[in-house]
A protein has these predicted regions:
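Intrinsically disordered, polar/acidic, low-complexity terminal segments
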Residues: 2-70, 74, 79, 92-98, ...
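Transmembrane alpha-helix segments characteristic
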Residues: 320-347, 406-407
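Juxtamembrane "helix-exit" motif on the non-cytosolic side of transmembrane helices
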Residues: 41, 136-144, 212, 243-252, ...
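Perimembrane helix-loop-helix junctions
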Residues: 198-238
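Short hydrophobic alpha-helices at membrane interfaces in multi-pass membrane enzymes
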Residues: 169-187
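Transmembrane alpha-helices and membrane-interface helical segments
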Residues: 115, 162-169, 203-211, 230, ...
């Protein structure tokens, strides 16, 4: 058995024996060490992209079924949206509380994995090696420092470790309470992430592989005869959830998976990302806007393939039923390839498979599979035994400990490199800090803003209106206003978050006139533009001079404004939408003596920063 064969020459207990006596304490120490590392990574992280959309939704929508059950990028996550709603109401844009939630979930997953490994393999020091791998691999890193990913992925990790623990307890003793516990943990995961549905496949593989016997038909008959209640319960829950997901969450066609070749996705997912992570890689990253893709060297890939294949072959040569141990990981990898082919890869291509957040469960399933490949599963009728007459060349405690430490240190290097890129390339914190600073620096508040979207480097425009100022900056509502008409003062933020006066580039102008241009007289005045206008998002800048103040009605296509013309020289800004080629002004005072000098229509842009 790995880590448990060699005894010390010195008097007293051997190192494996001492570790066995203090296994829980050592495991807890490893979990705390990982949490400290993740806390460091989170301390330099902040809200990014989908986090902003999540807060925008929570700040502007009521807490009802429409809010909770809305599909977000194909995700059905009412539990996640409920957590987001509570955090937003209590601590919008206060990162420390959101980071604390990620840490708590990571702690639960770590403790749950320790508990699961002890339940599966007993008090063997090899459990510590397995736990170290789970805690140090980069698979769960992006989910651990990016809230939008973590609120999906970490509940899946929790559901996996606690759900499988309960499922194994049911298989051993057939107690209904264990079955209920398994269903509750799985349902918990489903509230956050539809991919939790794959746990039913994992439960099935464990049941058929280790708690039945004979050929496949005999195994299936045995499962039905002995675990019928679980089969019916799991099928019912999975069927009901699948129907709910198809109704509320599915926003892509599974049939489109045939449009994207599977082989490049599988190569990126398994050959580049997964295999190199299992030896502590990938060591090298391809930076994106903020996140990073695995970008291992060819040497790293060759070493990882040799190491992974070598472990699998060695397990096969020294153990009696090691091959089935890899079925759990193989099942989820196959599902991941199919899911990426039907959704994400159709949009961004097969390189998306080099993003570890699409296979976070691989960390847990690899260490579980590694344990099953070498150790007997406690309480299972199918026992993984040593092959007679085969030497255990590579199972000394020193070798296992050295390999574990080497992988953990390598993973720490890969993790640090990823975190450095993540922390250095996220522009969100600086942008929103500058927004708040420049708004608070304005003496005349609330500041009138054009309600456009924040830069697409922070949140894509397809999330409109979630990306608009009025939604994302709802927490600053006391400092802002969003008029559809304003005199002289109208602002936007530039790409750095600095407050700037609006500039209206000339897409359309009034037809040229000498002198006054257009004098408001009679009951109404039409100002023709030099071309037709169609669509929305337009603003008009109307420069005028008036001897006295007057009310006025401005019709700009479908937008009608009842506003004021102040005395003196001013610029009036009004929004415009629809199909039109003439600006109509009416309902002004007959003695106002207003002269319109120029009219400019365009899509508003940031000007120079306000001083």
């Amino acid at each position: 058995m790995p880590g448990g064969r060699r005894t010390s020459r010195r008097t007293g207990a051997s190192l494996p024996e001492r570790l066995s006596r203090h296994l829980v304490a050592c495991g807890a120490g490893l979990v705390l060490l990982q949490l400290a590392f993740r806390a460091w990574a989170l301390s330099g992280s902040w809200f990014y992209f989908d986090d902003l959309a999540f807060m925008s939704r929570a700040m502007n929508q009521p807490l009802d079924s429409s809010y909770l059950l809305e599909s977000y990028g194909g995700h059905l996550m009412p539990g996640g949206f409920l957590v987001v709603y509570g955090l937003t109401k209590a601590a919008a844009f206060s990162w420390v509380w959101w980071a604390a939630v990620l840490l708590v979930m990571q702690a639960l997953a770590g403790v749950g994995m320790l508990r699961l490994l002890l339940s599966m393999f007993g008090r063997t020091p090899f459990v510590l090696a397995l736990l170290t791998g789970y805690l140090s691999f980069v698979f769960t890193l992006s989910a651990g420092i990016w809230f939008a990913a973590g609120i999906n992925q970490l509940p899946l990790q929790i559901a996996l470790v606690f759900g499988l623990h309960a499922h194994l307890a049911y298989l051993r003793h057939r107690r209904v309470r264990s079955l209920v516990a398994c269903l509750l943990w799985t349902a918990f995961g489903l509230l956050f992430y539809e991919k939790t549905l794959l746990l039913f496949g994992i439960y099935a593989l464990v049941t058929v592989g280790w708690f039945s016997h004979g050929r496949t038909p005999e195994r299936l008959r045995h499962v039905w005869d002995h675990y019928r209640t679980a089969v019916v319960s799991y099928t019912a829950v999975a069927g009901v959830y699948l129907a709910i997901y198809v109704h509320y969450g599915l926003d892509f066609s599974p049939g489109t998976s045939n449009a994207q070749p599977w082989s490049p996705i599988a190569w990126n997912l398994v050959g580049e990302a997964m295999s190199t992570a299992l030896i502590g890689g990938p060591f090298r990253w391809e930076p994106l806007a903020v996140g990073s893709f695995a970008d291992p060297s060819q040497l790293t890939m060759l070493v990882s393939w040799a190491a992974v294949l070598g472990v699998a072959v060695y397990a096969y040569r020294t153990r009696t039923i090691s091959k089935r141990a890899w079925s759990l990981l193989g099942f989820t990898l196959l599902c991941n390839v199919a899911l990426l082919a039907s959704a994400r890869a159709n949009i961004v291509g097969p390189d998306i498979a080099r993003e570890y957040r699409y296979q976070t469960e691989s960390a847990a399933l690899f260490v579980i599979g590694l344990g099953l490949a070498f150790l007997p599963l406690v309480g299972a009728p199918q026992v993984n035994r040593h092959r007679e007459g085969v030497p255990f060349t590579y199972e000394t405690p020193r070798l296992i400990a050295s390999a574990t430490v080497a992988v953990a240190l390598a993973a720490a290097y890969s993790t640090s490199a990823y975190v450095d890129l993540w922390q250095d390339r996220n522009p969100s914190r600086a942008y929103f800090a500058e927004v708040r600073h420049t708004l608070e620096a304005e003496s005349d508040r609330p500041v009138p803003l054009v309600d456009v979207g924040i830069p697409q480097t922070l949140l894509w425009a397809y999330r409109y209106p979630e990306n608009s100022y009025s939604h994302v900056l709802r927490h600053l509502s006391r400092l802002t206003s969003y008029p559809d008409a304003s005199t002289d003062r109208l602002f936007m933020f530039d790409d750095t978050g600095s407050l700037t006066p609006v500039r209206i580039p000339a897409t359309r102008r009034d037809e040229a006139h000498l002198g006054c241009g257009y004098e408001l007289k009679g009951s109404s005045t039409d100002i023709p533009l030099d071309g037709p206008v169609i669509g929305g998002g337009w603003w008009i800048k109307l420069d005028y001079e008036a001897t006295s103040a007057s009310s006025v009605r401005v019709v700009a296509g479908d937008d009608v404004h009842e506003t004021e013309l102040d005395a003196g020289e001013h610029s009036l800004y009004v929004s415009a939408e629809g199909e039109f080629d003439t600006l109509e002004l009416s309902d002004y005072a007959s003695d106002a003596d207003v002269c319109v000098g120029s009219v400019t229509l365009g899509l508003p842009e940031p000007g120079r920063p306000s001083t």
